[in-house]
Regions:
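Accessory beta-strand-rich segments of carbohydrate-active enzymes
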Residues: 2-14, 18-22, 26-27, 41-45, ...
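Mature N-terminal segment immediately following signal peptide/propeptide cleavage
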Residues: 32-43
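Generic detection of short hydrophobic beta-strand segments and adjacent strand-loop junctions
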Residues: 34, 66, 107-109
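Active-site-proximal helix/loop capping residues that flank conserved catalytic or ligand/cofactor
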Residues: 38, 61-62, 107
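Short Gly/aromatic-enriched secondary-structure transition segments
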Residues: 50-68
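N-terminal glycine-rich cofactor-binding segment
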Residues: 82-94
């Protein structure tokens, strides 16, 4: 019998890869921050395994536009899931169902040499479940 291989996003011991310690964040408007809110390129898939080969480097022909922040279910992708009643998928910890809606977001951001002379932190709020980030093709 073939053993099912657990995927990275099924490992409950992984709470972050390459991320800073969690802490309270207080914000103020400053020239030292860039908002990434706005239109992003978006590709919806039924499962992460369906991600196109090299998607982090390839173009976005055939991708859609989606506003960030938003919830893709409210933009016509997938359906809303209300877990206060009943899960819509079989629960078999630690395995994630093979049909696992996935969104790939892309945005081009240009930073000046002056900006890059300082530490730069990429901060995401409200990401649901697991996610990966590539910057200039680097994981």
């Amino acid at each position: 019998m073939k053993q099912r291989v657990k995927k990275r996003w099924e490992d409950h011991t992984i709470t972050g890869i390459g991320r800073r310690e969690a802490r309270a964040a207080f914000y103020e408007d400053t020239s030292e921050k860039i908002s990434l809110n706005g239109q992003w390129k978006f590709l919806y898939l039924e499962a992460p395994e369906l991600s196109p080969e090299g998607f982090m480097n390839a173009g976005t022909d055939g991708w859609y536009e989606i506003d960030v922040p938003s919830v893709w279910q409210l933009r016509g992708y997938d359906a809303m899931h209300y877990t206060d009643v009943l899960y819509l998928f079989p629960i078999h910890p630690p395995y994630v169902p093979s049909q696992n809606p996935t969104g790939i977001y892309k945005k081009n951001v240009v930073l000046t040499k002056e900006w890059l002379a300082n530490d730069t932190v990429l901060r995401f709020h409200g990401v649901d479940s697991a996610f990966d980030v590539w910057v200039n093709g680097e994981y």
